[in-house]
Design a protein with these regions (language model features):
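Metallocofactor- and cofactor-centric catalytic cores in central/energy metabolism, strongly enriched
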Residues: 1-213
Length: 213
C-alpha cells in the first residue's frame, strides 16, 4: 500500500497535480492544505459510493416502469407496492396494479433530479432523527444533485473549507442510504418478491476451525 495514500495527503484531482503534502510543502498548488485534501478525497469517495448505489436504484426504477403482466418483469409483491404508493400519495383505488407501479416508478425517478424539496424516504426515519438532520442542514435533496455538488465543490478553485466538505459528505451519504438505497431495496422486493425466512440443511462440513463462521 502507498504510505502517502494511507495518510490521505496526496491530491490528484486537477491537471496541475498530483500534489503531495510534506513538512516543507504544506499546501498544494491551489493552496489546499492537508485538511482540505483529505476532505476532498473523502467527499469524492462518498460521491462515488452514492452514485453506485443510486444508479443501481435508477435501473430498478426503470425496470418497474416497464413491468407488465405478460412481460419479462412482473409485480411479485403487490401489497408492498400499494403501501409505497400510499406513502407517496399515488392513487390506488380502482386502478390496475401495473398502472400504479408505473406511476410509482415515475415518482421514484424524479427523486434523482427534482428541482425542489428533500428525499421522500426521509419521513420514514424516526421523527427525532429527522429533526437532527433538519437542524444540521443535511437533509438530502435530489440524489444526482448531491453527487454533482460534491464533484463541483471538490474541484480546483472551489470549496476549501473542511467543515463544508464534511457537511456535504454527510448530506450525500444520506442521499445514498435514505434515497437511492431505499428505492433499490423497496423496488427489488416489489419486483422480485420480499425475502422470507426459510429452512435449509447444513452439516459440520461448513465449519473451519481457523475461521469465524
Amino acid at each position: 500500500q502507498c504510505g502517502f495514500g494511507l495518510q490521505g495527503n496526496c491530491c490528484r484531482i486537477c491537471g496541475m497535480g498530483p500534489c503531495r503534502i510534506t513538512p516543507k510543502t504544506p499546501r498544494g498548488l491551489c493552496g489546499a492544505d492537508e485538511h482540505v485534501i483529505v476532505g476532498r478525497n473523502f467527499a469524492r469517495m462518498v460521491a462515488g459510493g452514492t452514485a453506485a448505489h443510486s444508479d443501481h436504484a435508477r435501473d430498478i426504477a426503470h425496470t418497474m416502469a416497464l413491468a407488465s403482466r405478460n412481460g419479462n418483469y412482473t409485480i411479485k409483491d403487490e401489497s408492498k407496492l400499494i403501501t409505497l404508493a400510499k406513502e407517496w400519495d399515488v392513487e390506488t383505488e380502482g386502478r390496475d396494479i401495473y398502472d400504479i407501479a408505473h406511476e410509482v416508478a415515475d415518482v421514484a425517478l424524479m427523486e434523482f433530479g427534482k428541482p425542489y424539496g428533500v428525499a421522500r424516504f426521509l419521513k420514514n426515519a424516526p421523527v427525532k432523527r429527522q429533526k437532527v438532520w433538519k437542524e444540521l442542514g443535511i437533509e438530502p435533496r435530489a440524489i444526482d444533485r448531491e453527487v454533482a455538488t460534491i464533484m463541483h465543490s471538490t474541484h480546483i478553485g472551489c470549496t476549501a473549507d473542511i467543515d463544508s466538505l464534511i457537511h456535504m459528505s454527510l448530506r450525500t451519504s444520506l442521499a445514498d442510504g435514505w434515497a437511492g438505497s431505499m428505492i433499490g431495496t423497496r423496488f427489488s422486493d416489489i419486483l422480485f418478491g420480499t425475502p422470507t425466512v426459510g429452512e435449509t440443511e447444513a452439516n459440520l462440513g461448513v465449519l473451519e476451525e481457523n475461521k469465524v463462521n
